[in-house]
């Protein structure tokens, strides 16, 4: 009868004929009864199901139809199985009850329970089991029951309280329940339950998870079955739910096909994290490459009963796809199940069994042959083979540049066609993964493909799904490779590469307990981290196979058992997305290698719960996170990662050998690579140099981020510059960084800095922090490809503050070198600048000067400086290793590896790219419409302000903060001259000086026209703030002086005669200013002592001022000023329309000069010149 009533869901039937009749009768009784409860309980709900089902109903149920409660059920179970249940809803009352009765007798507890009366916080129900019915449907793992429930209502109850005889049993159940009223007929209850007959054990027992569908209205059996099928669709995550019998049959068919009788997991190919040994010894010319999507691995299994997906744990999903023809039945193919917005995909990357052939160990079927078989399956079975032409289909020559250009175009066309086909699909879209197989013409070829795939798919957004990494598959091996974990470094395996930020270890976790058995809570007393903030200590376990059984053991690094200190929110330990993480589950962690000065327990950061592995632990007591040996291997990739930049360098034939040499020389040593993020260590070393760098940044920010500015800070890191923007009076600030940990997770994150600043500073501007990568476009779609798994609040910030928003100033301090790695990254960065910067807005940049480093490294491999510590050991302060070749064209992709002892652990190198001033100025003008306003070397600023900083701060009336910074910089200057407390300080100062003087700053403005006579605003602002006599700066545009670039000469006399001839009729009052540079050699860097000399030329009745400036490169320039003391100020009088130049500025120039002369105290002794 049941089968005849089904009219949907592929005629799926839940009830047998007998069950059907019994349930009809139960529904009739429910409709006629007053106090009957009718509910369906779903068995075998594990933690992954619990989380997925909860999330599903939260997303589809209106907020006013959702209830959540935490309460304690105390049930008195009588010999006749009837139940008297008291529910306590007040958490304080629950705590008091547990404390009071933890050691009491059962009789005392029973008498207390019966003494309670119903109230707002107490609910009492009597369950009459004798009046109910129960049907178990094992084939669908559900129980259908009806029970009489009589609530006790104060003063209205029809039943009396039970008498305590001592024969009662007590059961305690602490519940966290979510209730969803999904329609007018039914309610879904999802409950996390801790059950125990012993009260004091209640909070220590593991959770069970319950799912119930309860009727709230009268319905017929067809409606009930339809409701149940809808729930099964959610539980099984499929449109076609299947019974336990069908699932068991599919698993049995799979085991028989592959002759793997005892397994509870897929017999799939192992994929291991790639390391330098694999790159050096195995991958070149022997591997193909494809992308790894952010999806789940499944086998697709074709049978005569349908097509199914088998998960790692042999969970079965049935697909809504017609049965294939007989030749393609008993077929197994390996792939990724990928969910995207609006479409689901299954991407096949290998074949296991097809048309009677087992491909697992057959060496005659290499990868290229299996690819042909996969293509045929996709075409014949699913009709989704999208054409992709091999290079040799259209070309005869094998040249890397031609191949690269061809595949870039072919991939773009392929994915365009792919998306068109996908958008037309209404069901699961099944197609192939695309492999690029090298021709073997150069060892760099495979890495060229890997670099191309990653950048085009991620930063150019070619794919409709997010990437999780790159897969390297051996060309000449069968599907399965024989060899255990011990052989992973001795034979070719399949390798997985992930960006270093996503290298993670899966741990089985247990929280430390207190004396009561509950999770222990500790409080952080560190002011630097989070004073007084509560946290839990999480013990981190991995799996170890011992005598054929897997057991969890605590993960160790250098013999130290690893733990994670996880801060709590509302009493719950949470992952980075704010989701609670629970005891006895498997959680994915990343390790923040940038927290250099913190204990390891603060560096482990939980990313997400791994529900698949948690399920495996709960079902089979297997997969306690990663296996120990696998975890150790991943740890090596965390501490010595293969970065995107290394892959890119390996993909360039001109730098391949050099990169291989670096990987070989430093393999398993302290030469580590770190990408895209670095932060200053908490150290007193080179405090003067750091203060000097910050002083320059402060003045840039204060000058160009004026009151009311809206600022976008690209590469804001952990917010070290926030106070600078606050002091500048900005109105609104948005900081962007690729490192989400530095923005939000760690204790000294940008967000935490902002919160702390708000406590001490009034009227602080709104500041927001967005996890984003400027190498991709600032759109949500683009950023989700680069940073998969970002939380919803970050998506909201991108849409709100990046998409369609423009800023007065964009700040980019010491990060632009990351965006010059390749053309695609640079183009995206420039598009972002163009899209986000207002007209007439400013772009502020600091970076190494590429010309300086390029010149110093000509014919050399490295540039470094060192110092001797207090133990007499010589330490490298910084080292730059040249990755590029001297023959490379200056511009993009000029790679160096930088070790900086201030930001990195010993041996940790950061890949950067040289920033060449000429390239930067030309490219930003062409791509963004930016004009250079001003730029100079830190070296020149350093020399210019030497006299100022060598004076004590007391002479300037500074604030305490300013005086501290001034003092640090002053000591830096003095140390360089040998005037310090000890030789170590002198040594460190000189070593740090060599690093700092490699830097340059730039200010660009977004405007189509710019006046070359515009002054150096940074210098003017500096001078105003320090109230110091104005120095003549080594700039072309400085202190509102106009420099006549047309009359530059190396002969001062010719310049002077030119001025005299030009202004013969004005009888000028002339001063000749000579900028003398006395050079002191310090290793290969020169210290310059500036000296200003003045010569009085001639007096006049209506004096004019003419100046000659000698630049550091020994060029002489005429400078023009005119004093309008005898006439009112009029802009028209100082502007030369015919030359479109300002001849002079107002009284301020003369005032500046007078101050300068007075400060020198030389005016009285200046000789007259005829």
Curated annotation (Swiss-Prot):
Domain mRNA cap 0 methyltransferase: residue ranges: 684-1007
Record-listed S-adenosyl-L-methionine binding positions: 697, 715, 737, 813-815
SUPFAM superfamilies assigned: CYTH-like phosphatases (SSF55154), DNA ligase/mRNA capping enzyme, catalytic domain (SSF56091), Nucleic acid-binding proteins (SSF50249), S-adenosyl-L-methionine-dependent methyltransferases (SSF53335)
This enzyme's EC code(s): 3.6.1.74, 2.7.7.50, 2.1.1.56
Site positions for mRNA cap binding: 724, 753, 817, 912
Annotated mRNA binding sites: 693-694
Gene Ontology cellular component annotations, sorted alphabetically: virion component
Keyword hit for Phosphoprotein: no
Protein's cellular compartments: Virion
Recorded catalytic activity of this chain's protein: a 5'-end triphospho-ribonucleoside in mRNA + H2O = a 5'-end diphospho-ribonucleoside in mRNA + phosphate + H(+); a 5'-end diphospho-ribonucleoside in mRNA + GTP + H(+) = a 5'-end (5'-triphosphoguanosine)-ribonucleoside in mRNA + diphosphate; a 5'-end (5'-triphosphoguanosine)-ribonucleoside in mRNA + S-adenosyl-L-methionine = a 5'-end (N(7)-methyl 5'-triphosphoguanosine)-ribonucleoside in mRNA + S-adenosyl-L-homocysteine
A GO molecular-function descriptor: polynucleotide 5'-phosphatase activity
PROSITE patterns: RNA_CAP0_MT (PS51562)
Active site per database record: 292
Alphabetically ordered keywords of this record: GTP-binding, Hydrolase, Methyltransferase, mRNA capping, mRNA processing, Multifunctional enzyme, Nucleotide-binding, Nucleotidyltransferase, RNA-binding, S-adenosyl-L-methionine, Transferase, Virion
InterPro entries, alphabetized: CYTH-like_dom_sf, mRNA_G-N7_MeTrfase_dom, mRNA_triPase_Cet1, mRNA_triPase_Cet1_sf, NA-bd_OB-fold, RG7MT1, SAM-dependent_MTases_sf
Pathway in which the depicted protein is active: mRNA processing; mRNA capping
Main location: virion
Gene3D superfamilies recorded: DNA ligase/mRNA capping enzyme, mRNA triphosphatase Cet1-like, Nucleic acid-binding proteins, Vaccinia Virus protein VP39
Family classification: In the N-terminal section; belongs to the dsDNA virus mRNA guanylyltransferase family.
Function (record text): Responsible for methylating the 5'-cap structure of mRNAs.
PANTHER family: MRNA CAP GUANINE-N7 METHYLTRANSFERASE (PTHR12189:SF2), MRNA GUANINE-7- METHYLTRANSFERASE (PTHR12189)
Protein name in the entry: Probable mRNA-capping enzyme
Organism of provenance: Acanthamoeba polyphaga mimivirus
């Amino acid at each position: 009868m049941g089968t005849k009533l089904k009219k949907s869901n592929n005629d799926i039937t839940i009830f047998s004929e007998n069950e059907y009749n019994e349930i009809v009768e139960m529904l009739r009784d429910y409709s006629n009864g007053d106090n009957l409860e009718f509910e369906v309980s779903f068995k075998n709900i594990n933690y992954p199901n619990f989380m997925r089902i909860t999330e599903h109903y939260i997303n589809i149920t209106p907020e006013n139809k959702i209830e959540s409660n935490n309460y304690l059920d105390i049930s008195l179970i009588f010999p006749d199985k009837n139940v008297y249940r008291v529910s306590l809803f007040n958490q304080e009352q629950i705590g008091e009850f547990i404390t009071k009765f933890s050691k009491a007798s059962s009789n005392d507890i029973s008498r207390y329970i019966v003494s309670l009366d119903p109230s707002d916080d107490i609910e009492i129900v009597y369950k009459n089991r004798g009046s109910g019915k129960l049907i178990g449907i094992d084939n669908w793992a559900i129980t259908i029951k009806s029970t009489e429930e009589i609530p006790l209502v104060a003063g209205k109850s029809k039943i009396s309280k039970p008498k305590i005889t001592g024969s009662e049993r007590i059961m305690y159940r602490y519940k966290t329940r979510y209730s969803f009223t999904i329609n007018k007929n039914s309610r879904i209850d999802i409950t996390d339950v801790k059950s125990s007959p012993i009260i004091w054990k209640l909070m220590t027992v593991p959770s069970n998870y319950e799912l119930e569908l309860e009727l709230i209205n009268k319905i017929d059996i067809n409606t009930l079955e339809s409701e149940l099928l809808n729930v099964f669709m959610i539980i099984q995550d499929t449109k076609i739910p299947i019974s336990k019998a069908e699932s068991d049959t599919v698993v049995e068919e799979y085991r028989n096909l592959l002759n793997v009788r005892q397994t509870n997991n897929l017999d799939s190919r192992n994929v291991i994290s790639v390391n330098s040994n694999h790159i050096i010894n195995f991958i070149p010319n022997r591997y193909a490459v494809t992308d790894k999507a952010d999806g789940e691995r499944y086998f697709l299994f074709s049978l005569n009963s349908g097509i199914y997906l088998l998960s790692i744990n042999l969970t079965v999903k049935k697909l809504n796809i017609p049965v294939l023809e007989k030749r393609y039945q008993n077929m197994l193919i390996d792939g990724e199940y990928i969910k995207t917005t609006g479409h689901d995909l299954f991407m096949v990357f290998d074949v296991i069994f097809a048309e009677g052939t087992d491909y697992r160990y057959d060496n005659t079927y290499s990868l290229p042959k299996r690819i042909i078989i996969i293509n045929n399956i996709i075409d014949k079975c699913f009709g989704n083979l999208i054409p992709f032409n091999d290079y040799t289909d259209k070309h005869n020559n094998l040249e890397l540049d031609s191949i690269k250009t061809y595949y870039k175009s072919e991939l773009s066309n392929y994915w365009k066609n792919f998306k068109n086909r996908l958008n037309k699909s209404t069901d699961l879209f099944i197609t192939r993964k695309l492999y690029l197989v090298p021709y073997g013409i150069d060892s760099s070829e495979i890495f060229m493909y890997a670099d191309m795939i990653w950048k085009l798919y991620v930063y150019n957004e070619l794919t409709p799904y997010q990437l999780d990494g790159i897969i390297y598959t051996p060309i000449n091996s069968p599907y399965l490779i024989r060899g255990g974990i011990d052989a992973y470094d001795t034979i070719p395996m399949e390798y997985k590469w992930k960006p270093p930020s996503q290298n993670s270890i899966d741990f089985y976790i247990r929280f430390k307990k207190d004396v009561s058995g509950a999770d222990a809570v500790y409080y952080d007393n560190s002011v630097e981290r989070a004073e007084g903030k509560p946290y839990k200590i999480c013990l981190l376990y991995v799996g170890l196979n011992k005598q054929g059984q897997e057991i969890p053991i605590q993960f160790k690094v250098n013999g130290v058992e690893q733990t994670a200190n996880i801060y709590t929110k509302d009493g719950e330990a949470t992952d980075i997305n704010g989701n609670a993480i629970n005891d006895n589950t498997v959680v994915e962690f990343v390790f923040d290698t940038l927290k250099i000065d913190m204990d390891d327990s603060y560096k482990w950061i939980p990313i997400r719960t791994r529900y698949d592995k948690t399920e495996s632990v709960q079902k089979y007591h297997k997969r306690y996170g990663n296996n120990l040996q696998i975890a150790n291997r991943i740890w090596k990739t965390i501490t010595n990662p293969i970065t995107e930049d290394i892959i890119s360098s390996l993909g360039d034939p001109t730098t391949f050998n050099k990169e291989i040499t670096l990987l070989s020389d430093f393999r398993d040593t302290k030469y580590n690579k770190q990408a895209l993020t670095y932060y200053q260590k908490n150290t007193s070393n080179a405090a003067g140099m750091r203060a000097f760098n910050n002083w320059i940044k402060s003045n840039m920010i204060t000058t160009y981020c004026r009151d009311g500015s809206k600022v976008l800070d690209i590469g804001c890191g952990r917010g070290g510059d926030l106070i600078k923007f606050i002091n500048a009076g900005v109105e609104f600030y948005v900081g962007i960084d690729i490192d989400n940990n530095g923005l939000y997770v760690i204790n000294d994150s940008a967000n935490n800095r902002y919160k702390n600043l708000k406590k001490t500073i009034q009227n602080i501007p709104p500041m927001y922090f967005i996890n984003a990568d400027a190498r991709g476009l600032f759109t949500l779609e683009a950023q989700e490809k680069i940073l998969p798994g970002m939380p919803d609040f970050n998506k909201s910030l991108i849409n709100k503050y990046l998409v369609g928003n423009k800023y007065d100033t964009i700040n980019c301090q010491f990060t632009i070198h990351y965006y010059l790695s390749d053309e695609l990254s640079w183009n995206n960065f420039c598009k972002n600048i163009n899209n986000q910067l207002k007209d007439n807005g400013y772009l502020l940049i600091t970076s190494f000067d590429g010309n300086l480093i390029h010149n110093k490294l000509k014919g050399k491999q490295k540039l470094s400086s060192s110092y001797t510590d207090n133990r007499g050991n010589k330490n490298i302060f910084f080292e730059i290793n040249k990755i590029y070749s001297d023959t490379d064209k200056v511009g993009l992709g000029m790679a160096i590896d930088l070790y900086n002892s201030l930001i990195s652990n010993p041996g940790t190198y950061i890949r950067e790219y040289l920033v060449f001033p000429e390239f930067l100025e030309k490219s930003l003008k062409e791509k963004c419409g930016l004009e250079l306003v001003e730029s100079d070397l830190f070296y020149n600023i350093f020399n210019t302000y030497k006299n100022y900083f060598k004076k004590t701060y007391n002479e300037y009336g500074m604030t305490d903060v300013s005086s501290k910074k001034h003092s640090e910089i002053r000591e830096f200057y003095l140390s360089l001259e040998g005037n310090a407390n000890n030789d170590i300080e002198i040594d460190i100062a000189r070593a740090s000086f060599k690093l700092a003087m490699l830097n340059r700053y730039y200010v660009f403005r977004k405007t189509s026209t710019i006046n070359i006579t515009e002054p150096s605003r940074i210098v003017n602002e500096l001078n105003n703030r320090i109230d110091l006599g104005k120095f003549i700066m080594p700039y072309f545009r400085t202190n509102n002086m106009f420099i006549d670039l047309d009359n530059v000469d190396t002969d001062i006399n010719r310049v002077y005669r030119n001025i005299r001839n030009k202004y013969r009729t004005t009888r000028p009052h002339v001063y000749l200013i000579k900028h003398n540079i006395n050079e002191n050699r310090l290793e290969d860097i020169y210290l310059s002592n500036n000296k200003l000399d003045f010569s009085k030329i001639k007096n006049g009745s209506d004096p004019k001022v003419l100046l000659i400036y000698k630049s550091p490169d020994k060029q002489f320039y005429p400078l023009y000023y005119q004093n309008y003391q005898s006439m009112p100020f009029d802009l028209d009088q100082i502007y030369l329309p015919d030359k479109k130049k300002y001849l002079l500025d107002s009284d301020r120039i003369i005032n500046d000069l007078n101050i300068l002369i007075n400060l020198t105290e030389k005016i009285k002794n200046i000789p007259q010149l005829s």
